[in-house]
């Protein structure tokens, strides 16, 4: 069973309907949006490519991974700091900590984790205020692959993140979306 669960979890990042939902969400949001992913080849690159096809030049799309040199990461940060029509598709490892972009208005956890510190640091990217900004919206995409009494790991991790959001007194709303 552990092996099966792991395979299901990895397959989520390559689910076309799930990725289409994330792409449509990011494309429809107003302001700068940070899309955080875990797997570069399996998830980050497909999200980036699909976003480029979807927005067709109406927004600037940036891709950041561990292979992106620091100078280019800084350039993305500066551009996003000066403009408000960007989507940054970044790996958790590169943009979850140490990045200061007060103009981030939306964060999408495309492949969230259960780590409290990592999640709070990632949310912190959007909590930095700038003139005219009062809040940041977090879209925590969780997958319910439950079957009978079995609960998948990503759903369990989502439950743990909800506990964190409650502890931190974040206002949140759960919206169920059927993507099939």
Task: Walk through the language-model features, giving the residues of each.
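Single conserved hydrophobic/aromatic residue that forms the stacking wall/gate
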Residues: 1-10
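Short, flexible loop segments at the rims of nucleotide/cofactor-binding pockets, characterized by
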Residues: 11-15, 63-67, 85
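Conserved strand-helix element at the start of the C-terminal RecA-like helicase core
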Residues: 14-19, 24-50, 165
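Long, largely alpha-helical accessory region at the distal end of helicase-like NTP-driven motors
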Residues: 32, 170-180
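Conserved helicase motor "Helicase C" RecA-like lobe of SF1/SF2 P-loop NTPases
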Residues: 34-68, 75
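Conserved beta-strand scaffold positions in the cores of enzyme catalytic domains, especially
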Residues: 61-63, 138, 172-174
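Conserved RecA-like P-loop NTPase helicase motor core
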Residues: 66-167
């Amino acid at each position: 069973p552990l092996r099966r669960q792991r395979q299901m979890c990895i397959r989520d990042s390559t689910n076309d309907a799930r990725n289409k939902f994330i792409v449509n969400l990011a494309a429809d949001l107003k302001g700068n949006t940070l899309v955080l992913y875990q797997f570069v080849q399996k998830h980050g690159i497909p999200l980036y490519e699909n976003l480029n096809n979807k927005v067709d030049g109406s927004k600037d799309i940036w891709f950041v991974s561990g292979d992106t040199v620091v100078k280019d990461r800084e350039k993305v940060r500066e551009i996003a700091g000066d403009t408000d029509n960007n989507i940054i598709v970044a790996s958790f490892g590169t943009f979850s900590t140490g990045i200061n972009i007060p103009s981030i208005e939306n964060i999408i956890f495309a492949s969230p984790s259960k780590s409290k510190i990592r999640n709070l640091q990632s949310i912190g990217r959007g909590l930095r205020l700038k003139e005219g900004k009062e809040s940041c919206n977090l879209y925590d995409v969780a997958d319910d692959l439950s079957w009978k009494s079995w609960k998948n790991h990503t759903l369990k991790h989502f439950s743990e993140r909800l506990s964190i959001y409650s502890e931190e007194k974040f206002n949140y709303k759960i919206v169920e979306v059927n993507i099939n």
